[in-house]
Amino acid sequence: MARGLKKHLKRLNAPKHWMLDKLGGAFAPKPSSGPHKSRECLPLVLIIRNRLKYALTYREVISILMQRHIQVDGKVRTDKTYPAGFMDVVSIPKTNENFRLLYDTKGRFRLHSIKDEEAKFKLCKVRSIQFGQKGIPYLNTYDGRTIRYPDPLIKPNDTIKLDLEANKIVEFIKFDVGNVVMVTGGRNRGRVGVIKNREKHKGSFETIHIQDSTGHEFATRLGNVYTIGKGTKPWVSLPKGKGIKLTIIEEARKRLASQQAA
């Protein structure tokens, strides 16, 4: 009889966006319980060892974490399989480096280097707004936070700008037509564009039509859309490519041009 959680994860069953090679062993690090879903996160061990290359082995990662060198969203984390996810800020004070976890246009996690000023806040999508004991309002965000007494104008699917030091809402963005968004799920994950219109289907999913800066239009579900700025200006800096997905021909031309330049 099964008792409790699975403690292992086979390498072949790990999410594709972790980009683990098949011949690197039988197992992959199983993410701990935390603010992000296990299929939508990147464990700290993979960030330090596979992405930043600050460690060669699992044991080296443990010793780095136990020296309390790694912070996620301003808090020291010592759990080697802590699940960092979309919009999380990973800081290494010893090297004065800050990274924000974003998606590239192929749907893979990208550690985007940011300045100290930008590392002080993060954008959180509002999951729901409820009332607790004695009618105290509070909101839940997509990264598992609960914030009491929010602005009454904030509604589900809006995005809040959260000060990580004070844990307070600084500003918020309404989920409206004309605002810039990033897609966080589905085949268009990582693409950035402006909301053109919302299609409401009774008893089914709401469809959002988005147009990127090159004029290409695409559609996705409401749950996959994350507002990142007012108008066409995003509040966070974006990785190289600015969330514009190239066609296969455009990618091939770009590759040829870079090879000829080299």
From Swiss-Prot:
Q: Name one GO biological process term.
A: translation
Q: What is its main location?
A: cytoplasm
The record's annotation in SMART domains points to: KOW
Q: May I have one GO cellular component term?
A: cytosolic ribosome
Which Gene Ontology terms cover its molecular function?
Answer: rRNA binding; structural constituent of ribosome
Pfam family for this entry, one = 40S_S4_C
* Alphabetic keyword roster: Cytoplasm, Ribonucleoprotein, Ribosomal protein, RNA-binding, rRNA-binding
The record's section on InterPro entries has: KOW (IPR005824), Rib_uL2_dom2 (IPR014722), Ribosomal_eS4 (IPR000876), Ribosomal_eS4_C (IPR032277), Ribosomal_eS4_central_region (IPR013845), Ribosomal_eS4_central_sf (IPR038237), Ribosomal_eS4_KOW (IPR041982), Ribosomal_eS4_N (IPR013843)
Q: Where in the cell is it found?
A: Cytoplasm
Membership in a protein family = Belongs to the eukaryotic ribosomal protein eS4 family.
What is this protein identified as? Small ribosomal subunit protein eS4x
Organism, by scientific name, is Arabidopsis thaliana
